Amino acid sequence: DENPIAETLNALWVLREKKNYYDAAKNVASIMRSYFAKDGQEDTKKYANDYTNKYRYAITVFICSVYKRPKLYYGFNAICYLSNGNTRTFINLCRTIISDALFYEKKKFIDTGMVSKEVQSRAIHNYSQAEFDEICSIIKYGNYIRNFVMNIGNIFSTFHKDRKMRYPETNQFVFSEVNLYPQDREIIEVAKSWAMIIKKEKAQRVTASIDKKADIYHINKIFYPIFNISYRTRGGVNPTFSREEIHGMLTSMNYSPISLDNESKPENKHQKTRNNGRDDGQLSLFDIGGVWNDE
């Protein structure tokens, strides 16, 4: 039977091997068969972790972005994560889902008390977009905050489509508030007060490979469906932005300080390629990310 997730994972393993690709392909095919046959071959434990957890969501996002297949947010976990612990958001998401269920599949909903994943996904996406559209209603600095959320979302949308899966489920970032330009610092404070961006309570490691702690931020998770960003946090790579880059993302709709190349991770300033223009494919509303439909 076809298994696009396993096939893509196999290709990823081959690409990361430094030996002969043909031998690597035969080896990973053997490991895959052993994993599904449950015969205990060496390396099946690592393959199992990559297949069921580490890369499953990232691979699903990538495959769906290539084939323009819908990705779905649905279920209690998705609603809880997207709500960011905000009771109002949680209730509004549930209300929107029920309202859509009564409109699109009333008989099924009344008979079974259940809502299909497609209807849940549509409702969550629409609510996410409506919340994003409301950012400009913030009287002070609303347009700047909208620019910032848009640019950050575009960056992580690009990360999620990386063909080598170097940034699986990356959705957090780092910057120094004290080093910002005075007005930019004020804008960030307004954005935080409205929970448009959220600061982690405790400083965390910047990246898995750098033993340095810093303040970690993310945009409100209710916006994640717009940009096809996983609500899970892997924390392997948290790109760091300078005050000039933060200023650019606040003041321009089309500012992208990071451009992915094929060789390096953007873990520090020396590994970033600047690009003040946005890749035309960065903002893609082709559908919804989160709890993926693996069918």
Model-found features: residue ranges?
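Repeat-unit-sized solenoid/scaffold elements
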Residues: 1-29, 108-118, 180-189, 218-241
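P-loop NTPase catalytic cores that bind/hydrolyze ATP
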Residues: 1-15, 69-104, 182-197
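Long, low-complexity, polar/charged, intrinsically disordered or flexibly structured peripheral segments
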Residues: 1-67
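Winged-helix-like regulatory helical subdomains adjacent to P-loop NTPase cores
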Residues: 21-24, 28-32, 36, 71-73, ...
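Short, flexible coil/linker elements and helix-boundary hinge sites characteristic
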Residues: 36-37, 68, 112-113, 228, ...
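Composition- and surface-driven signal marking solvent-exposed, interaction-prone regions
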Residues: 77, 92-96, 103-111, 202-213
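Long, compositionally biased intrinsically disordered regions
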Residues: 166-295
